[in-house]
Amino acid sequence: MGGTGTLKAVLFDRDGTLVVDVPYNGDPQLVRPMDGAVAALQKVREAGLATGVVSNQSGVARGLLTVDQVASVNRRVDQLLGPFDVWEVCPHGPADGCACRKPAPGMILSACETLGIAPEETAFVGDIGADVEAATAAGSRAVLVPTPVTRQEEIDAAEVVARDLSHAVELILGGSIALEKDTAGQEAPA
């Protein structure tokens, strides 16, 4: 596994991380992988690590999507980028107070339970602060891959920031994600 130590899985946010974010997307035909996603996932799998998707889908609670539409989009993501070993989806809204919606750690903990591994054996890659907060709360390693919707304070607060999904996977497989803050490929001064 070269440099991954006790890492056994990499979990990913869906929208804005693995696929181009289409707000409240219920149409599988609109699913487009992020640049480099296919190759990045292949590297993770070749390293012998499990993969999974952890995604907030509040469009269900808001009445903008059905559970079936979310499942249909997820099937398309799996066709293009999978197979994934585990899927966790939160259909709740921000005010619902559930334990699964990121930044709560519930979905990451559930994914780890399904995989039979400890959260500490997992890395989580996402594009917003709630992703990093969920991973941290679960005890997993977090990597932020900023997009235009990522706020500067979320970038500043993240311990590890990768320039894109491929770079995130390089950091994870290189075993450096617990050791450095990497911004745009440059190590932060000690």
Where does each model-flagged region fall?
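Asp-based, Mg2+/Mn2+-dependent phosphohydrolase catalytic module
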Residues: 2-4, 8, 68-86, 94-124, ...
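A short alpha-helix capping/helix-coil boundary motif
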Residues: 18-21, 54-56, 86-88, 109-112
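Active-site neighborhood of HAD-like aspartate-dependent phosphohydrolases
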Residues: 2-52
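Substrate-recognition element of Asp-dependent hydrolases with the DxDx(T/V) motif
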Residues: 37, 41-74, 83-96, 135
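Metal-dependent phosphoesterase signature
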Residues: 14-35, 60-69, 79, 92-99
